[in-house]
């Protein structure tokens, strides 16, 4: 597996995770924070983009979903820190490291 392939796959995973998180965060803003119901339109677009991006990944769907989970966790932790402005705990960091280690094992098996 080339470094370029890994970088492209990682970028695709990150874009997919952002599309999913935004697609779920916008309805949260409407339901929990009292923002406009119109947020459901970009949420639906974001979730449709998420589903489309999943089809672009370079392995069988089950393997993609499993490996994608690691990037999703990492992206969610970054979101927690940047968007929610919540400090990260050692448990957040250690748990994320374990998840990413598992993801690395899965991706290594794609060879």
Swiss-Prot record:
InterPro entries: UPF0060. Keywords: Cell inner membrane, Cell membrane, Membrane, Transmembrane, Transmembrane helix. It is a multi-pass membrane protein. Its main location: membrane. The chain crosses the membrane at residues 10-30, 36-56, 64-84, 90-110. NCBIfam families: PRK02237.1 (NF002586). This is UPF0060 membrane protein IL1642. The keyword Transmembrane helix applies. GO terms for cellular component: plasma membrane. Belongs to the UPF0060 family. It holds the Pfam family UPF0060. It comes from the Bacteria. It is found in: Cell inner membrane.
């Amino acid at each position: 597996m080339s470094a370029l392939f890994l970088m492209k796959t990682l970028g695709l995973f990150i874009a997919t995770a952002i599309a999913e998180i935004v697609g779920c965060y916008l309805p949260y803003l409407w339901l929990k924070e009292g923002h406009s119901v119109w947020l459901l339109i970009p949420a639906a677009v974001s979730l449709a983009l998420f589903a489309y991006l999943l089809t672009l990944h370079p392995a069988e769907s089950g393997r993609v979903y499993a490996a994608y989970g690691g990037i999703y966790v990492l992206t969610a932790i970054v979101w927690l820190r940047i968007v929610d402005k919540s400090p990260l705990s050692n448990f957040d960091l250690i748990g994320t490291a374990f998840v990413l280690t598992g993801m690395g094992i899965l991706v290594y098996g794609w060879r």
